[in-house]
């Protein structure tokens, strides 16, 4: 079309604009360098029939920001405790769940998680001088510098027997140094949203700046349960293997679980099956326990108690807590 006067020019402009709109020019976007200032915005509207929503970070997690009471539970003299319905995503009970406490050997859950994430079960580990832990009362298997075993073997001994010296062996074998491995532990905690905890070692012996919360332990334990090997180990009542000593000889391992439900020293609550978990005890942390359990319908729960005053009271209180797992 040829426009020959002002009136026709206006018509031409209108028709050209309409043509651009109908042909999609209205959806054009302008490319421009990110480091330059322009007086226009660059955007594009896309029409779709799909209905989409963003998935919240905690969409598959239980959440707790305050104490939660339960008529079936009456706990006293514990540092913190919580019971989580992992299918229904409900917090059934919580007391001081976000209070920072000493974790003792529950630290080893994070150690196992990071080792499984960064290592391979068949990789060989060699003990260094750093496995010599001299703290009084520390649970040790007794490995010596130069002893070797696979990560698979080490994780079994670390989780079932709660061996602190083997935790160091795992950290150095997988991370190269304890410091690097502990860095990974803290990075993993942050990635999981466990933002109220901080680790300074892989075993859980008391150190300044080494702390967790009951809720953060739930997050870490839940993630570790995604690994088949971790699931397998925490359910075992005993473990036997052989490792190679620094002298080249084979040494037998014969250990039993520290979980008093699994070894039969304490009866499981009626209608509850304890699948497995992790124990922890130090003078600063008291007696601690985290468990995966199922009720009579097979529904899974995670329960945790921190800083109980004795082993007996720990298991009595845990049995009381699990009564709410209906």
Residue map of PLM features:
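Conserved, well-structured beta-alpha core segment at the onset of a catalytic domain
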Residues: 1-3, 19, 197, 206
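Bacterial N-terminal signal peptides that target proteins for export
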Residues: 3-12
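Active-site-adjacent loops and short helices of periplasmic peptidoglycan-processing enzymes
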Residues: 28-215, 224-225
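Sec-dependent N-terminal signal peptides
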Residues: 12-18
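C-terminal motif of bacterial Sec signal peptides marking the signal peptidase cleavage site
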Residues: 20-24
